């Protein structure tokens, strides 16, 4: 796939530099140093290519989950009946064992990256919906009333008041979506992905503790970097909007 080829074609020094600069922008010196060291570990471990495939699969799945989940979350936040229906739906999704998601997608699409993405999207969809709905519902009613009195239309109210104020909460939902996507990618190694999850699975079948530990740490470090950057950006938005 073109996106996958693009990720694999980027030289690792460029990727490390860009992500470190992003970390510095949101979290300043400490976060940038932490990010640089964690990325260097992945490079030194020799698993950079598999890490980039993991980032590609996780990133693509999270984007799809957010495209589906955030609008549904907005709808749930504005409509009580939709909120009840979607809450029941995502509660059901979250109670299913992770292996269950693989059964229907393998039957329909066989094995491969696309199958893995569908399973990951289904597994990671819940936080995108839940946190967005929570962010929309928790906006101060006085701000809504003031906006309506000022003459805001419903469209302006949504895009200029509700969404900006709910954005820190939405970012935390994206953060949780990334965490769930990464955890599911280890399971989707069973359907033929060639990422860090496959490395963990191979290590498990061969009882190779060292190999499994290094691959597991690489997955954990990707999660830590994403978590720290998103939380830092969310905190900055809270300060900006006085939340």
Where are these regions (language model features)?
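Alpha-helical membrane-interface segments at transmembrane helix boundaries
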Residues: 1-8, 48-56, 60, 83-86, ...
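N-terminal, non-cleaved signal-anchor transmembrane helix
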Residues: 1-56, 63, 230-243
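Transmembrane-helix boundary motif in ABC transporter permease subunits
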Residues: 21-24, 39-49, 61-90
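Membrane-spanning helices that line or support transport/gating and their immediate boundary helices
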Residues: 50-54, 74, 84-88, 131, ...
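Generic hydrophobic transmembrane alpha-helix motif, especially the helices
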Residues: 57-60, 65-68, 77, 90-124
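Glycine-rich helix-loop "coupling/hinge" segments at transmembrane-helix boundaries
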Residues: 107, 136, 181-222, 238-243
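Transmembrane alpha-helices
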Residues: 118, 122, 154-188, 210, ...
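Short cytoplasmic-facing helical segments at TM-TM junctions of multi-pass membrane proteins
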Residues: 128-173, 200
């Amino acid at each position: 796939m073109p996106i996958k080829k693009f990720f694999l074609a980027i030289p690792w020094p460029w990727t490390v530099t860009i992500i470190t600069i992003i970390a510095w922008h949101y979290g300043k010196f400490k976060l940038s140093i932490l990010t640089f060291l964690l990325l260097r570990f992945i490079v030194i471990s020799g698993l950079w290519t598999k890490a980039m495939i993991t980032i590609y699969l996780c990133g693509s799945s999270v984007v799809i989950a957010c495209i589906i989940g955030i609008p549904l979350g907005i709808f749930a936040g504005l409509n009580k009946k939709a909120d009840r229906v979607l809450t029941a739906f995502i509660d059901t999704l979250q109670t299913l064992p992770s292996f269950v998601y693989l059964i229907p997608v393998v039957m329909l699409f066989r094995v491969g990256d696309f199958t893995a993405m569908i399973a990951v999207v289904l597994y990671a969809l819940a936080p995108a919906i839940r946190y967005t709905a929570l962010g929309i519902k928790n906006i101060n009613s006085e701000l809504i009333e003031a906006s309506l009195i000022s003459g805001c239309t419903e469209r302006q109210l949504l895009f200029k008041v509700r969404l900006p104020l709910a954005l820190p909460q939405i970012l935390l939902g994206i953060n949780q979506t990334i965490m769930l996507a990464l955890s599911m990618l280890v399971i989707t190694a069973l359907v033929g992905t060639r990422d860090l999850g496959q490395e963990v699975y191979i290590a498990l079948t061969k009882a190779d503790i060292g190999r499994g530990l290094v691959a597991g740490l690489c997955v954990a470090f990707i999660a830590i970097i994403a978590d720290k950057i998103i939380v830092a950006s969310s905190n900055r938005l809270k300060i900006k909007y006085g939340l």
